[in-house]
Regions:
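Histidine-acidic metal/acid-base catalytic patches
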Residues: 2-34, 38-54, 59, 63-74, ...
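Active-site acidic/histidine proton-transfer and metal-coordination neighborhood
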Residues: 13-23, 27, 120-219, 226, ...
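N-terminal small/glycine-rich loop or linker at the start of catalytic domains
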Residues: 44-56, 108-119, 156
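Active-site-proximal loop/turn and secondary-structure-junction residues that shape catalytic pockets
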Residues: 59-61, 87, 112-115, 155-157, ...
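A structural motif
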Residues: 78, 141, 146, 241, ...
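Glycine-rich, proline-tolerant flexible connector loops at the mouths of alpha/beta enzymes
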Residues: 83-99, 153-160
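Short amphipathic alpha-helices and their capping/turn segments at secondary-structure boundaries
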Residues: 90-103, 133-143, 229-239, 273
Length: 311
């Protein structure tokens, strides 16, 4: 697979303490009690999280140049970026140069045509436009050194049934597999509010039917809060998750709101634990409102605390 290798978190083991003055356990410090007749072992600090912290390119101030935006992302603590599909070849080259200059990786591509031109459409012309957009996204990914392209696979609506969305989209995605394999780019299926793949079991089944390492999941933490639990999705999809989007969601009496990380209903401690259990070591990319340096630095610190478990 082209996505980064999974690294297991370090598991620390603690042996029973010896009597006062008798030896210490490896990896822990032995402290004598006030009676000097027993000892207590200090718990080693958790190992650093292997998850890479990122954000979508559109969160950065548009008034800045490509290089300035990417340097800002790096300066406030982000390691990777997700960039949008860029059909203009010159602009795509400039994005690459800017990322190199800023020493930040364009980790993945946000495909831009799947909502306007869904692969599940019954209109062949619409589907071809969608396929063309994905091909551009895959080539962008290769140019930028990315390893995944996000894809919304289908849209269920009055014209497209759930069954048709399933079969049509799989048929079209299979047409993209040879290119994805050639370029070694994962097509990462995201769960969104498209009335499709409404449970982690369905999503796992849908992806599993491709029987290809080049089709994996892009899991969005905030998107499932209305009807599910992110930690459940993470455990169910497990090693099939290639990338992650970070959002937070808050229920309100008069509806709902997308809010900053930690200000909504996501149980971040449970999410963090689920990532640990599954050994997730990919990217966690913020998909939030944009803002200035002060705001972005605050978002970066929230990721440190809520997702990476750093104080």
């Amino acid at each position: 697979m082209s996505n980064p290798s999974r690294r297991d978190f370090l598991k620390s083991t603690v042996s029973k303490a010896f009597s006062a003055g008798l030896g210490v356990c490896a990896g822990a410090e032995l402290f004598a009690t006030s009676t000097a007749s027993s000892a207590v072992l200090a718990t080693p600090p958790p190992s650093p999280s292997p998850i890479k912290k990122g954000l979508v390119f559109d969160m950065l101030p548009s008034k800045l140049s490509y290089v300035e935006r990417m340097k800002l992302a790096r300066d406030v603590g982000f390691e990777v970026l997700q960039a949008p599909t860029t059909p203009d070849e010159h602009a795509a080259e400039e994005m690459k140069k800017a990322a190199d200059a800023a020493n930040i990786r364009i980790d993945s591509v946000m495909n831009m045509d799947h909502w306007k031109y869904p692969l599940s459409s019954s209109d062949a012309a619409v589907v071809e436009k969608s396929l063309a957009g994905m091909r551009t996204s895959l080539h962008n990914a290769k140019l930028w050194g990315s390893d995944a392209v996000l894809l919304v696979p289908a849209v269920v609506n009055p014209q497209t049934s759930y069954r048709d969305a399933w079969s049509r989209s799989q048929t079209q995605i299979r047409k993209l597999l040879p290119l994805a394999e050639e370029l070694k780019i994962v097509i990462a299926i995201e769960e969104v509010w498209n009335k499709f793949l409404l449970s982690p079991l369905e999503m796992a089944k849908y992806i599993g039917e491709f029987q290809s390492p080049w089709i994996q999941a892009w899991f969005d933490v905030g998107n499932v809060v209305l009807y599910g639990y992110p930690q459940d999705w993470i455990r169910t999809l497990g090693k099939g998750i290639a990338k992650v989007h970070l959002k937070d969601f808050k229920r309100k009496k008069d509806g709902f709101a997308w809010v900053n990380l930690g200000d909504g209903d996501v149980d971040w401690e449970a999410v963090r634990q689920a990532f640990r259990e599954t050994g997730y070591s990919g990217s966690a990319i913020c998909e939030l409102d944009g803002g200035d340096e002060v705001y972005l630095r605050d978002v970066s610190r929230r990721v440190d605390r809520l997702v990476l478990g750093q104080s």
